[in-house]
């Protein structure tokens, strides 16, 4: 027993990032040496499943508890967060238009993807998003509908604040703390989960996607990296007035890296909340803004929809005018905000955007098929960009408020001791 305790202590004594990198390397090596060891891949499935399973419960109890205690203050910070989420999503779509014009690509169309749930227009996408607000609360938790979870958690928390006994509020607070502890245990096992996810990806996909669709993939990933490393930091600098890169790299390292392998913004919500706690953010604030960001902060989705649509237009020889490109940017940004309410996410919103240029649904669905082929890389980078951005802008709004109040920013950001 002592030996086991020592092993656990040594494991916990190593930085989580170092452990994840070791797991990543081991997973890649195992995939090349023993590609038939399916049990390794199951570790990844278990990790993602655990995160997806606990995330809806975590969001509900934390938001409800914060409101029931009467300490939640959705002040100007919340408005700033929503503004930053929407602004960066639109800018991402606009930048995708610019890069597509600078580096136009055509593709070999794949077999059409099969789906019965392709949205017919922007109205349907936004209608689905609004309908999700009032979905059955139990169903919302079971299906991971975070718009619905947020709505009912707010209703429950406000009602509990009004009529709940003090002992009930304490129980709700203790429940939130208990769920948060479970999340910490799950995240502590991330190296094994990442090892399994890397193993599955390397052993099943290899490098084949880079040969046939390399240019399209390079354009998508390059645009997302430009957004993550240039545009978002510039916006953060405007609000913070100091070098944003320590925060950017920390969010990419501690949020984006995990999101890259889980390929799920929902699964990464617990990871992001743990990171917000480390950054010293207000729990009452980030408990709402992080789940909301997983729904509407969709820079990567806006880039994917825009570039894939313009690639389809280039393939068919359709000339896209500047006004049409601006309309596409707005449509992609709004559609991306509703991507979480559509089965298949950003890829199945491509036909909606293609309809702007009169591209047939058959061709649009072939582009969706291409998307699924390159998805192992495209979707990974997209999710990493989206998820890291959730924390970046929640922190930016919070630290901006600190500056206005004369409060010192964190030492890691300014390099000055407080």
Protein language model features and the residues they cover:
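Membrane-water interface of transmembrane alpha-helices in multipass transporters/channels
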Residues: 39-40, 75, 171, 207-215, ...
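Short amphipathic alpha-helical coupling elements at transmembrane boundaries
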Residues: 41-49, 139, 170-185, 247-258, ...
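Transmembrane helix boundary and interhelical junction motifs in multipass membrane proteins
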Residues: 58, 193, 264-272, 302-308, ...
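Transmembrane alpha-helical segments and their short flanking loops
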Residues: 307-418
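Hydrophobic transmembrane alpha-helical segments of multi-pass transport and channel proteins
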Residues: 50, 86-90, 94, 221-225, ...
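Helix-loop-helix junctions within the multi-pass membrane cores of secondary transporters/permeases
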Residues: 254-336, 394, 407-415
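Membrane-interface alpha-helices at helix entry/exit sites of multi-pass transporters
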Residues: 73-81, 181-188, 278-294, 322-323, ...
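Signature of multi-pass transmembrane helix bundles
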Residues: 7-33, 48-51, 76-247, 407-413, ...
């Amino acid at each position: 027993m002592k030996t086991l305790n020592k092993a656990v202590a040594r494991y916990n004594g190593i930085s989580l990032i170092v452990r994840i990198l070791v797991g990543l390397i081991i997973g890649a090596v195992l995939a090349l040496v023993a590609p038939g060891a399916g049990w390794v891949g199951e570790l990844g499935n278990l990790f993602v499943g655990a995160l997806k399973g606990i995330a809806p419960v975590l969001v509900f109890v934390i938001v409800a508890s914060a409101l029931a205690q009467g300490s939640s203050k959705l002040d100007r910070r919340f408005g700033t967060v929503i503004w930053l989420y929407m602004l960066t999503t639109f800018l991402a779509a606009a930048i995708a238009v610019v890069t597509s014009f600078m580096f136009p690509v055509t593709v070999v169309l794949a077999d059409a993807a099969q789906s019965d749930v392709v949205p017919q227009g922007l109205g349907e996408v936004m209608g689905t998003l609004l309908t999700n607000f009032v979905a059955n609360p139990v169903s919302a938790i079971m299906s991971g509908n975070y718009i619905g979870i947020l709505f009912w958690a707010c209703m429950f928390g406000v009602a509990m604040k009004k009529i709940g006994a003090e002992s009930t509020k304490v129980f709700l607070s203790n429940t939130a703390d208990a769920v948060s502890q479970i999340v910490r245990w799950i995240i502590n096992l991330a190296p094994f989960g990442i090892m399994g996810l890397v193993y599955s990806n390397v052993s099943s996909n290899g490098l084949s996607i880079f040969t046939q669709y390399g240019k399209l993939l390079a354009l998508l990933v390059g645009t997302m990296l430009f957004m993550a490393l240039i545009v978002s930091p510039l916006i953060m600098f405007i609000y913070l007035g100091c070098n944003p890169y320590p925060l950017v790299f920390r969010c990419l390292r501690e949020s984006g890296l995990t999101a890259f392998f889980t390929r799920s913004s929902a699964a990464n919500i617990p990871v992001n909340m743990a990171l917000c706690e480390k950054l010293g953010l207000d729990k009452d604030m980030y408990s709402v803004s992080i789940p909301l960001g997983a729904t509407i902060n969709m820079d990567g989705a806006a880039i994917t929809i825009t570039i894939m649509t313009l690639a389809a237009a280039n393939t068919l020889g359709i000339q896209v005018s500047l006004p049409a490109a601006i309309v596409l940017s707005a449509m992609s940004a709004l559609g991306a905000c509703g991507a979480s309410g559509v089965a298949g996410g950003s890829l199945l919103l491509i036909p909606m955007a293609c309809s702007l240029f009169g591209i047939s649904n058959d061709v649009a669905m072939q582009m969706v098929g291409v998307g699924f082929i390159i998805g192992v890389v495209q979707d990974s980078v997209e999710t990493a960009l989206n998820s890291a951005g959730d924390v970046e802008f929640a922190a930016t709004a919070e630290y901006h408020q600190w500056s206005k109040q004369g409060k010192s920013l964190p030492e890691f950001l300014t390099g000055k001791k407080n």
